[in-house]
Design a protein with these regions (language model features):
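N-terminal subdomain of nucleotide-sugar transferases
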Residues: 1-55
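Conserved donor-binding/catalytic core segment of Leloir-type glycosyltransferases
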Residues: 212-228, 233-237, 249
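Acidic anion/phosphate-binding donor-loop and adjacent secondary structure
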Residues: 177, 194-209, 229
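Nucleotide-sugar-dependent
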Residues: 14, 228, 279-286, 293-314, ...
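A short, well-ordered alpha-helix in the C-terminal region of glycosyltransferases
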Residues: 350-353, 357, 364-378
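Nucleotide-activated donor-binding/catalytic signature segment of Leloir-type glycosyltransferases, i.e.
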Residues: 242, 251-252, 257-284
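Membrane-proximal helix-turn-helix segments that form the acceptor-binding/catalytic region
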Residues: 108-111, 115-119, 145-165
Length: 400
């Protein structure tokens, strides 16, 4: 197949790949022709080249990553469609594709995906990893109803244009059906988050190097944006401050990291340790040496969401404690898989009770970690993601 990936971000060749680059690599390794279009904020002109074995079109664009101003980020995302069309006409106007694969965010690129679909007579696979604008509206990041309407129209067109919509949980699938009952969308299918895990190296010195040799280490890793409730981490840290054995290790980037650092300083939470963000392979190997993985989602979130950091915890074989929005079936997933416990983010006392249970029972931690790893191996490897998608795509092409 000839496949075009539309990505919001693509790490430079000398950096570790992310989940979408790893997925594209699976397509390439299985004999498919892969082209990637991704933004470039450094150069003033778009350009095409070879990276990681792919044909890559780097599209001149405005910065969308790590932007604190929602207005600047919104404007940058809104202009992506224009810049992508410009680069497509310059470099790919005669190219033919069988499938277009695009993850969300950003839903604002769905118009461009529809444009390529018409020009190339291709099929469109939408990987739904965030549901806009409902998600940002529910946590107060979007207030203007005109902007909401604009984004909602973009979302509707994307759902209508897609031939297949890969949802990260059954709750996601139900939410789309419930929000758009009269909308004729693409086929809704289940596609869990995935991560390409390295061969984990058991490094018994890693704790000693970090000064954590005798500590109970709870890790919060990945993104720290507005969708994560940093107060949940701070609350647990404050509660367990008298216990010198417990450390909360934060390896994250995002607009809320500075706020958590400020809270930790103001409240003298010396048990919150911050490490710089690191390559994924190094991060996953470090993850395998900690005792507990933490998930925190803003309890005001109105949409079901399954954070990718939880998949990393499962891959590393560590138990999970999730403080999440109550309308989220992610809690059900980790509970039924046996990978951990969950509670509503607003129920801080229950979070403490669950933390205590995991902290005081090493056998429970081992049992949860093992169960999580089994779930990961069966559902969340990049190989499983590829096989799931390619089977769905082939069935769709065959009219099944």
């Amino acid at each position: 197949m000839r496949v075009l990936f539309l990505l919001l971000d693509m790490p430079a060749p000398d950096k570790s790949g992310d989940m979408y680059v790893h997925l594209a690599e699976q397509f390439l390794q299985n004999g498919h022709s892969v082209t990637i279009m991704a933004p470039d904020v450094v150069h003033k002109l778009s350009f095409v080249g070879q990276e990681r074995g792919f044909r890559v079109v780097r599209v001149r664009s405005k910065e969308t990553q790590g932007v604190k101003s929602m207005y600047k980020k919104g404007f940058a995302l809104a202009t992506l469609d224009y810049y992508f069309k410009e680069a497509y006409r310059k470099f790919l106007k005669d190219a033919q594709f069988d499938w277009i694969i695009m993850p969300t965010p950003p839903i604002t690129l769905s118009g461009f995906a529809s444009y390529v679909k018409r020009r190339s007579h291709a099929k469109f696979y939408l990987i739904l990893r965030d549901i806009h604008p409902q998600s940002v509206w529910s946590i107060g990041l979007l207030h203007n109803r005109v902007e909401y309407w604009f984004l909602d129209q973009k979302a509707r067109k994307g759902y209508q244009s897609a031939d297949i919509i890969g949802c990260m949980s059954p709750g996601n699938m139900f939410y789309i059906k419930d929000q758009y009952p009269t909308l004729k969308t693409g086929e809704l299918t289940l596609l869990y988050n995935w991560v390409k895990a390295p061969e984990f190296v058991t490094d018994k010195t890693v704790r000693a190097r970090l000064g954590l040799e005798e500590k109970f280490v709870s890790l919060f890793g990945g993104n720290l944006g507005k969708g994560q409730r940093v107060e949940n981490i701070a609350y647990l840290a404050k509660h367990y401050l008298p216990d010198e054995n417990i450390v909360f290790l934060v390896i994250a980037k995002g607009v809320e990291k500075e706020r958590l650092q400020r809270i930790a300083k103001e409240q003298n939470l010396t048990n919150i340790w911050f490490l710089d963000f690191m390559p994924q392979a190094d991060y996953l190997n470090l993850t395998s040496s900690v005792d507990l993985g933490l998930v925190s989602i803003n309890e005001s979130y109105s949409v079901p969401t399954c954070p990718s950091k939880a998949v990393s915890y499962m891959a590393a074989g560590i138990p999970i404690l999730a403080m999440i929005n109550p309308d989220n079936d992610y809690g059900q997933i980790i509970e039924e898989s046996g990978a951990g416990y969950w509670t509503a983010g607003s129920d801080k006392q229950h979070a403490v009770e669950l933390f205590d249970m995991i902290y005081k029972d090493s056998n429970l931690r081992k049992k949860m970690g093992k169960a999580g790893k089994v779930f990961y191996q069966q559902n969340c490897t990049v190989e499983v993601a590829y096989e799931t998608m390619i089977n769905q795509m082939e069935k769709h092409q065959n009219g099944e």
